[in-house]
Curated annotation (Swiss-Prot):
A Pfam family this chain is assigned to: DUF2577
Organism taxonomic ancestry: Bacteria, Bacillati, Bacillota, Bacilli, Bacillales
Domain of life of the source: Bacteria
Family indicated by similarity: To B.subtilis XkdR.
UniProt protein name: Uncharacterized protein YqbR
Length: 87
């Protein structure tokens, strides 16, 4: 899924549910597969199948590494998470 498609998907679902998205800080706990831990809940690990990672953060110089902090967008209900960028 391209970045523009993912953002559009998140926006449409937020409007449809009449609930805004949440922007949250998180930490990368695994890169293969990608898993993140929300800063607000140290015990909850978000699995790869719920995470959308932009292409630029998958490989190369900007690839995610374990322990890095990221900013994510979460739909209300926490069923999809999109990594915006490293922080």
């Amino acid at each position: 899924m391209r970045l523009s498609e993912a953002i559009k998907h998140l926006a449409v679902r937020a409007v449809d549910s009449e609930s805004p998205v949440d922007i949250l800080p998180a930490e990368v706990v695994s890169v293969s597969p990608v898993e993140i831990r929300l800063n607000e809940n140290d015990k909850l690990i978000i699995p790869a199948d719920l995470i959308i990672v932009p292409k630029r953060l998958r490989a190369g110089e900007e690839a995610l590494n374990t322990g890095e902090r990221v900013m994510i967008v979460s739909l209300k209900g926490g069923q999809s998470f999109f990594i915006l960028d490293k922080i």
